[in-house]
A protein has these predicted regions:
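C-terminal amphipathic helix plus adjacent low-complexity
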Residues: 116-164
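Nucleotide-sugar donor-binding patch of glycosyltransferase catalytic domains
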Residues: 33-38, 44, 80-123
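Anion (oxyanion) recognition and catalysis
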Residues: 16-19, 75, 98
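CheY-like receiver
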Residues: 14, 55, 114-117, 141
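Donor-nucleotide binding loops and adjacent catalytic segments primarily
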Residues: 1-58
Length: 164
């Protein structure tokens, strides 16, 4: 998924050197048709959340500008990731994901590096287990803090009433 239109040109150049490797990218070039099939192995899609997840589920590796949601989706699906951040929030996402072993960070879509990384990548299933437990972790945290919070809230309300 790319938000910088210049990245599309980089992908086209890379594809010319590696025409046998299938590439599916999503971009926000609204002036283009919804699906731009350059040839049998290069396709650009307009942003489409359903198609995006369908393509990601079947991909060998994922290259992105490091948006939070798509990085989490790739981690959940166990995909090796190359992150090419375009601004500070994405820099933070890329840094955090690389620390967790989810992928590599680059200044450009150097897809050779991603393919090399993908060969030895081992998904960390702990992330999936953590996500699946998220609801229970949150409920547990809320229950542990509910009694103390309620008491504090009522005390503050009582104090407010005294001043009225």
């Amino acid at each position: 998924y790319m938000v910088n239109s210049g990245f599309g040109e980089n992908i086209m150049e890379w594809h010319k050197k590696h025409p046998d490797i299938p590439l599916h990218f999503f971009w926000d070039k609204w002036e283009e048709e919804p699906v731009k099939k350059v040839d049998d192995t290069l396709t650009f899609y307009q942003l489409d959340d359903v198609e995006f997840l369908r393509q990601m589920a079947g991909c060998k590796a994922y290259a992105s500008t490091a948006g939070f949601e798509s990085i989490c989706e790739a981690m959940y699906l166990g995909k090796p990731i190359m992150m090419v951040p375009a601004h500070i929030e994405q820099d933070c996402n890329a840094y955090d994901a690389s620390l967790s072993g989810a992928g590599i960070v680059s200044n450009d879509f150097e897809l050779e590096r991603l393919l090399e990384f993908a060969e030895t990548y081992e998904p960390r299933r702990e992330f999936v287990y953590w996500v699946r437990r998220g609801e229970y972790l949150l409920l547990d945290l809320l229950q542990k803090n509910a009694a103390g919070y309620s008491q504090t809230l009522f005390n503050e309300m009582y104090l407010v009433e005294e001043f009225i």
